[in-house]
Amino acid sequence: MSKKYGGQISFDPPARLEKDQVVAKVVQLKGSALFMVVENNGQELLVEMPPKYRNKIWVRRNGFVIVDKSEFLEKDNKIDGTILYVVQSPLKNWKKQIYWPKEFADESLNQNDSEESSSSEEEYDSD
């Protein structure tokens, strides 16, 4: 008797996503374990972090997560899904996957470039 899969932090992407799993971008923290995320089509979802990982995984704004919507499809509920994966750097492994949305690939490239340039500026400013 196996337990239902909760969530995890992962540097390695899964080979494929199931039917009701989507890649989403974290837009806003709504509570201790609730996050507002946006799919690549612009649809906003309210998702929750599984209780097992609430104090162990840090989700940052403008980061990416894999959301499972299957559990909440038939329920009349405010919550639209559960976070399965928290995408961590390096993003290049994730962006190579066929399920990674093109809209997010462009955004994540720009985000990484700006982070690298700001960190290099800080190094020069400290002299």
UniProtKB/Swiss-Prot annotation:
PTM sites of type Phosphoserine: S126
Stretches for region Disordered: 107-127
S1-like domain location: 10-86
Disulphides: none
Major location category of this protein: cytoplasm
GO biological process, one term: cytoplasmic translational initiation
Entries under SUPFAM superfamilies matching the protein: Nucleic acid-binding proteins
Bias type Acidic residues, positions: 113-127
Keywords: Cytoplasm, Nucleus, Phosphoprotein, RNA-binding
GO terms under cellular component: cytosol; nucleus
Cross-referenced PROSITE patterns: S1_IF1_TYPE
InterPro entries, sorted: EIF1AD (IPR039294), NA-bd_OB-fold (IPR012340), RNA-binding_domain_S1_IF1 (IPR006196), TIF_eIF-1A (IPR001253)
GO molecular function: RNA binding; translation initiation factor activity
Phosphoprotein recorded as keyword: yes
Modified sites of kind Phosphotyrosine: Y124
Subcellular location(s) of the protein: Cytoplasm; Nucleus
The family this protein is said to belong to: Belongs to the EIF1AD family.
Protein name according to UniProt: S1-like domain-containing protein C146.08c
Native source organism of the sequence: Schizosaccharomyces pombe (strain 972 / ATCC 24843) (Fission yeast)
Taxonomic lineage of the native organism: Eukaryota, Fungi, Dikarya, Ascomycota, Taphrinomycotina
